[in-house]
């Protein structure tokens, strides 16, 4: 009996080991049969296994290279998970040096008549591209992916940039069942490793040290007719520090609305070089300050030198400025000139790609090409303009001083004790506005004397939307009326992005679709092209079914299609802070003329709401004057950050708004 028991235990162990075989190509039938994730059934895909190994390779010809080897196995549960079948690698280059991608291998596995079949990733499905002179991309999409497939791929990166180990992502928006991290660093490189402090997960790093021996045998030949051979044995010996993580069941990073950039909260292993100390060489300290980082960036020829160039634009700019004396007028004219002259090529960066002169001539450039040109023009016009370094939302919030902490640059103009931001990459941006991607907490302004300091990016004026409805309810209880609306700030920008390229019929159709069952006529929009002016919009409308007739009573929602009916905050709890896009204010005024065959039975009560210690307000006021009703609402959100512990209060604030917005006026027939 004891032997049978031991045999059973051994069998279970063997079966379990077989199911957990993560060697490349060893996908099991059990993995393919799995219909949903056992611990998170709602996910569309899951990483069954991820291996990320980093080490330094050495040879006597080229010295050290930094090698990264990645192997991932991913289960696709449904069609929504197909996006995980495409992998894009973006790598650095500098001059003739670049990160080389090699050894890309991939297989898609599926079951066919009970047998495991696979389709191999073909070379013609791997695409390599030079994004700009600083970045390359390698993209591949796994073949023949179906619901239930398992995909597997591996690749190797060989980098000449020895002092830069890429951050290692330890958490995805899908679960990771098994994670293995192994980083080996020679004693000559001293890195500080730490985790993203905003992440909710904790990981343990196992550290160990061993002696690494490298042996190189060189054969030489000498002599004329008589040849002699000698073998030279070169040995290099050094300590190698190993950092390992072996973790199972890493939960998915849950996306929450109004979270900013989700990966800011992902578990990440971050590497910062402290120093290098090679034999027979002086120790070099790489620890930096933010002042030092800013100075190095400014002194780079593709940054500071570009700010000094002006001859290429002087004649055109002189013509534009000759009748202007007020600084605000100069700012507006120069800003609009740059936006019209140079189109953004969708690439970020604080170093120029084409260079400001070629970008001006060709009409296209990256962020630095455009905004360093803008700064140079502003300075030429006598304004105090300086570059502001930014980390975009998808680049995260910089945690320690490094040039990689920034990836964007805008102009900052100091005028009347105010810092005015300008970004020429978006034709719909107004003076003083930053695009959402660049509104990421703090930027670093660098002055001409190389001094620098942090500046707030999240402030700015409140974006306002003011709407007035004048409505007549006829004796058949149908609505007809006119709406006038004024939009500024980001509300105006959003309108221009969505409507500027549409013809009138297309605009009416889009407005009708977004405003319930109204029928629109006489649409008029002003200041669409004048970006520095507010959008003014008006149209007439009919709404046949705006009131509900039950017996002798008529029920109507006085806000009609302006009603907020859905709470953006639905989840029971909150892991991450709520970050609204910008301060905002929405003011609605509805004037209703009632027919003579009804009288008011009941009206919603007036209400005012606020959140303690927040610049947040909601007001709802109803006034009756005979057959005329006026309903006024205001929602002002000047506070854009709410911590998780404030989530319940914010959620309830919106619940109360929705309850009030859905209250109805009751009329009675006379």
Question: What do the PLM-derived regions correspond to, one by one?
Answer:
Residues 318-323, 467-468, 575-580:
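Extended, non-catalytic structural segments that build the interaction scaffolds
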Residues 84-88, 195-197, 305-313, 333-334, ...:
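Short coil/turn segments at secondary-structure boundaries
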Residues 1-23, 670:
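Bacterial Sec-dependent N-terminal signal peptides
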Residues 143, 326, 330, 359-370, ...:
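Secondary-structure capping and boundary motifs in well-ordered enzyme cores
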Residues 80, 159, 321, 338-342, ...:
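Sec/Tat-exported extracytoplasmic proteins
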Residues 20-288, 292, 296, 369-375, ...:
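Beta-strand-rich, non-transmembrane domain signature
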Residues 289-362:
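Secondary-structure boundary elements
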Residues 509-670:
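A carboxyl-terminal module marker
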């Amino acid at each position: 009996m004891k032997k049978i028991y031991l045999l059973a235990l051994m069998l279970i162990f063997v079966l379990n080991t077989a199911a957990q075989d993560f060697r490349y190509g060893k996908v099991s039938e059990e993995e393919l049969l799995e219909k949903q994730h056992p611990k998170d059934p709602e996910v569309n895909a899951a990483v069954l296994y991820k291996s990320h190994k980093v080490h330094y390779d050495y040879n006597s010809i080229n010295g050290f290279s930094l090698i990264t080897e990645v192997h991932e196995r991913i289960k696709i549960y449904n069609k929504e998970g197909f996006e995980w079948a495409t992998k894009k690698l973006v790598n650095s280059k500098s001059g003739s040096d670049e990160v080389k991608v090699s050894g890309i291998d991939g297989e898609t596995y599926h079951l066919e008549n009970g047998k495991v079949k696979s389709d191999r990733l073909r070379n013609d499905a791997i695409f390599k591209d030079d994004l700009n002179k600083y970045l390359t991309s390698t993209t591949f999409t796994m073949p023949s992916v179906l619901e239930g497939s398992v995909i597997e791929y591996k690749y190797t990166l060989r980098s000449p940039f020895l002092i830069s180990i890429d951050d290692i992502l330890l958490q995805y928006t899908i679960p990771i069942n098994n994670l293995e991290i192994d980083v080996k660093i020679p004693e000559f490189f001293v890195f500080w490793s730490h985790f993203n402090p905003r992440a909710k997960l904790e990981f343990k790093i196992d550290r160990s040290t061993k002696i690494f021996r490298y042996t190189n045998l060189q054969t030489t030949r000498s002599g004329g007719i008589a040849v002699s051979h000698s073998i030279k044995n070169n040995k290099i010996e050094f300590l190698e520090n190993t950092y390992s993580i072996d973790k199972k069941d890493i939960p998915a990073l849950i996306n929450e609305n109004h979270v900013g950039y989700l990966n800011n909260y992902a578990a990440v292993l971050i590497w910062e070089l402290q120093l290098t100390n090679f034999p027979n060489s002086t120790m070099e300290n790489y620890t930096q300050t933010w002042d030092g980082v800013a100075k190095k960036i400014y002194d780079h020829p593709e940054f500071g030198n570009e700010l000094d160039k002006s001859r290429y634009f002087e004649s055109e700019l002189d013509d534009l400025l000759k009748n202007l004396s007020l600084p605000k007028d100069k700012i507006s004219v120069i800003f609009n000139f740059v936006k019209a002259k140079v189109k953004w090529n969708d690439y970020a960066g604080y170093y120029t790609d084409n260079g400001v002169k070629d970008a001006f001539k060709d009409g296209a450039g990256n962020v630095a090409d455009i905004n360093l040109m803008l700064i140079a023009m502003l300075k030429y016009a006598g304004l105090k303009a300086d570059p502001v370094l930014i980390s975009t939302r998808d680049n995260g919030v910089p945690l320690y001083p490094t040039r990689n902490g920034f990836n964007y640059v805008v102009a900052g103009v100091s005028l009347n004790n105010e810092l005015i931001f300008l970004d020429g990459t978006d034709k719909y941006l107004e003076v003083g506005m930053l695009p959402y991607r660049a509104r990421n907490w703090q930027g670093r302004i660098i002055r001409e004397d190389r001094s620098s300091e942090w500046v707030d990016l999240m402030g700015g004026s409140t974006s306002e939307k003011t709407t007035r409805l004048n409505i007549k309810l006829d004796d058949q209880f149908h609505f007809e009326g006119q709406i006038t609306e004024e939009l500024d700030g980001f509300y105006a920008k959003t309108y221009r992005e969505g409507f500027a390229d549409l013809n009138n019929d297309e605009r009416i159709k889009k407005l009708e679709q977004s405003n319930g069952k109204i029928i629109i006529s006489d649409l008029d929009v002003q200041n669409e092209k004048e970006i520095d002016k507010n959008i003014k919009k008006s149209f007439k409308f009919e709404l046949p079914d705006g009131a509900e007739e039950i017996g002798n009573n008529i029920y109507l929602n006085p806000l009609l299609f302006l009603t907020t009916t859905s709470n953006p905050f639905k989840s029971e709890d909150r892991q991450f802070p709520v970050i609204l896009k910008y301060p905002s204010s929405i003011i609605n005024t509805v004037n209703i003329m009632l027919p003579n065959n009804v009288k008011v039975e009941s009206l919603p009560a007036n209400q005012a709401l606020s959140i303690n210690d927040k610049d947040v307000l909601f007001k709802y006021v109803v006034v009756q004057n005979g057959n005329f009703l006026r309903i006024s609402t205001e929602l002002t959100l000047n506070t854009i950050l709410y911590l998780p512990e404030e989530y319940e209060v914010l959620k309830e604030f919106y619940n109360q708004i929705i309850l009030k917005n859905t209250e109805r006026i009751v009329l009675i027939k006379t």
